[in-house]
A protein has these predicted regions:
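Acidic, metal/ion-coordinating pockets
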Residues: 1-189
Length: 189
């Protein structure tokens, strides 16, 4: 937290720690993750990106009270899941799903704010010759372009198309739409 505090006090536009934390294969943040997020926001983090659980965990938008009594908005994604790995779906654990995160920031009058937050879910598929990654929403909406995928792959893509957004919004039920094959969350100040 000292590094985060030092960065915040240095006047950088955005403080975004990337944290390796959480319980493997658990789709909700554990108490240690929640405590770390509290401390990082308290130290001045604006956006927190997590990894390690090997599954997608929720995003959260929080109102943070600063020491001077003012408030600001903080953003956290507890886990981006697995982008590419040899871990497979089993017993309801979505170890074959990951997220690509995209954020837009705008600076006006010396203030930087988040104006866009998007997630593109990904699926890891296997054949005898290839381990690859496909974008879930694009594949779901353009099945013909991904004809090399097996029926098992299609079942996983359909499941993750629906379940990923449910997981992302378990803590903060934020309005979203799908734009360019990404879950696009509405950010308001």
């Amino acid at each position: 937290c000292d590094s985060v505090r030092a960065l915040d006090e240095s006047g950088v536009d955005v403080v975004m720690p990337i944290i390796h934390f959480g319980t493997e294969y658990r789709e909700m943040p554990d108490s240690w993750q929640e405590k770390c997020v509290d401390l990082l926001f308290e130290a001045g983090a604006d956006v927190i990106v997590g990894g390690h659980p090997h599954v997608v965990e929720p995003m959260e938008i929080r109102e943070i009270r600063n020491d001077d009594g003012t408030t600001r908005t903080g953003y956290v994604i507890y886990s981006l899941g697995n982008f590419i790995s040899s871990q497979r779906y089993e017993n309801g654990v979505m170890k074959d799903i990951g997220l690509i995160m995209d954020m837009d920031f705008e600076k006006q009058n010396g203030e930087t704010r988040l104006t866009g937050w998007r997630f593109a879910p990904t699926y890891v598929y296997w054949t005898d010759d290839v381990i690859g990654v496909v974008p879930v929403v694009e594949a779901y909406e353009n099945r013909d372009a991904y004809s090399f995928l097996s029926e098992k792959d299609w079942a996983r893509i359909e499941d993750s198309y629906h379940k990923t957004i449910q997981t992302l919004t378990k803590i903060t039920d934020c309005p979203y739409n799908i734009v360019d094959y990404e879950y696009n969350f509405e950010i308001s100040e």
